[in-house]
């Protein structure tokens, strides 16, 4: 069993940001959905981001989204990780996720701005029951 300290961030959905030495060192453990304690800290669940510092202003990230599991990317998760990495710094932060690369711009007393590509990854059909 592994334990990590996390930083709680609201963007405004809840995130627990965990920095690790290497995302590659413990691939199997990081692929499993983490258990967050105390559960009362996040009664509606939480997205958990594992992040690795690559260089100043550059991080790699994996994310477990609440109710879904590991996903290839998470915009609010990238913002949460960049905000924690930034500390009191401003500027553009590169966040590499399994689905590609995004950038988070952080300005003093301003909003976080997420930039990056948007790609269609699936197409489907939804049937809605009559009378609903």
Model feature map: region roles:
Residues 1-73, 82-132:
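Active-site proximal loop and beta-alpha junction motif in alpha/beta enzyme cores
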Residues 79:
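Catalytic, metal-anchored helix/loop core of enzyme active sites in primary metabolism
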């Amino acid at each position: 069993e592994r334990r990590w300290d996390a930083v709680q961030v609201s963007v405004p959905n809840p995130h627990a940001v965990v920095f690790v030495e290497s995302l590659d060192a413990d691939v199997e453990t990081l692929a499993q959905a983490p258990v967050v304690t105390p559960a009362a800290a996040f009664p509606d669940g939480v997205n958990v981001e594992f992040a690795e510092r690559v260089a100043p202003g550059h991080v790699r990230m994996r994310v477990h989204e609440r109710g879904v599991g590991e996903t290839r990317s998470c915009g609010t998760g990238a913002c949460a990780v960049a905000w924690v990495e930034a500390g009191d710094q401003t500027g553009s932060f590169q966040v590499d996720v399994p689905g590609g690369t995004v950038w988070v711009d952080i300005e003093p007393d301003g909003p976080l701005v997420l930039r990056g590509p948007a790609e269609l990854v699936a197409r489907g059909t939804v049937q809605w029951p009559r009378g609903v």
